[in-house]
Curated annotation (Swiss-Prot):
Protein family (similarity comment): Belongs to the bacterial ribosomal protein bS20 family.
InterPro entries registered for this protein in UniProt: Ribosomal_bS20, Ribosomal_bS20_sf
Function: Binds directly to 16S ribosomal RNA.
Gene name of this polypeptide: rpsT
HAMAP family, A to Z: Ribosomal_bS20
GO molecular function, a single term: small ribosomal subunit rRNA binding
Taxonomy, superkingdom: Bacteria
Gene3D superfamilies from the UniProt entry: Ribosomal protein S20 (1.20.58.110)
GO CC terms in record: cytosol; small ribosomal subunit
Keyword annotations from UniProtKB, A to Z: Ribonucleoprotein, Ribosomal protein, RNA-binding, rRNA-binding
Example GO BP: translation
Protein name: Small ribosomal subunit protein bS20
Pfam families assigned: Ribosomal_S20p
Length: 90
């Protein structure tokens, strides 16, 4: 229970930010899932991978996820994409 007006405002602001962060994190996860689904289906789509990487970068810049977390997830996605494109003749 907040004892001061500023503490009450902090609670409201934290709730808003948590919701915003949750929405952004969800967008990132969805983009990664779409890209991976395309890769595993045998139709690797560079545009989906690029979008997922862009969202990861933006989330890291905004402080929603740690920069190393974004780098690791981008690396793994790029590795899967490279493996799929090398395996499938275009």
């Amino acid at each position: 229970m907040a004892n001061t007006k500023s503490a009450e405002k902090r609670i409201r602001a934290n709730a808003r930010r948590a919701l915003r962060n949750k929405m952004y994190r969800s967008r990132v996860k969805t983009a990664i899932k779409k890209a991976e689904r395309a890769i595993f289906a045998g139709t690797p789509n560079a545009e989906l991978v690029r979008e997922a990487m862009s969202l990861l970068d933006r989330a890291a810049v905004k402080g929603i996820i740690h920069k190393n977390n974004a780098a690791r997830r981008k690396s793994r996605l790029a590795k899967k994409f490279a493996k799929a494109t090398a395996a499938s003749p275009s």
